[in-house]
Amino acid sequence: PWSEAQALCREVGVPFHCDATQWLGRMPGEGLDSCDLLTGSFHKLGGPKGIGFLRTSSEGSVRLLYGGQQEAGLRAGTENVPSILGALASLEESMREIADSSNRDLFEKRVTELIPGIQFLGAAAKRLPLVSSFVLPKFDNLRWINRMDRLGFAVSTGSACSTGRGGPSHVLAAMGYSPEAARRFVRVSGGWSNETDDWIALADAFGVAYEEL
C-alpha cells in the first residue's frame, strides 16, 4: 500500500521514497510520478546489471556523488551510455509485455497437486504477478535449492538483499510462521520472457524433487 505510506509521509512533511525495482515492467506504473524519490534497477527487466535510476522531485532532491555536474549535478562521473541505452531498451520491451498472474497461478495450482501440504504466502492478497513464495511441507530449503539446481532451475530462499544473513526471516516471523517453517521457505520468480511451458516445467521439477528428496 505505497499510496497510504505516502499519505502518512505527507502529513508529517517527510519526503517519500518508493523502491519500485520489483514493480517496473510487471505492473502499470500509474501514480508513481507523485513520489518524492523513486528508484529502480533494470536487471529485473532483463536489462544490464549495475544500472538503475533515481527520479527526484523538488522535495526529494538529493546529491549522490560530488565532483562533476553530470546528470543535473546529482551524480558526478562519466555516464555509462551503453548500459543506459540497454536499460531503456529493456524498459520499453517489458512495458509492451506487462505481465499478468495467469502463469504464476497455473504454477501454484500444479505444484499444489504435486506437493500436498504446500502453503503459499499472501495467496489472498494483491501480489506481484510473476513471484511465488511458499513454505514446503518438509525438508530444509537448502536441500530443495540444491535438488532444483540439479534439475536445471534456480530458486531461492528469499530476496537477494537477505543473502548471507543468518537465522530465519523476520518477515516470516511477523507473518506468524515458526522458525522451523521458515527454514522450509522457497521463492521463485519469472520474467516477462518466460512462457507458460516454462512455469509448468518448473512446477513439474518441484514434483520430481519432492519425490527424490
Question: Model-found features: residue ranges?
Answer:
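Pyridoxal 5′-phosphate
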Residues: 1-213
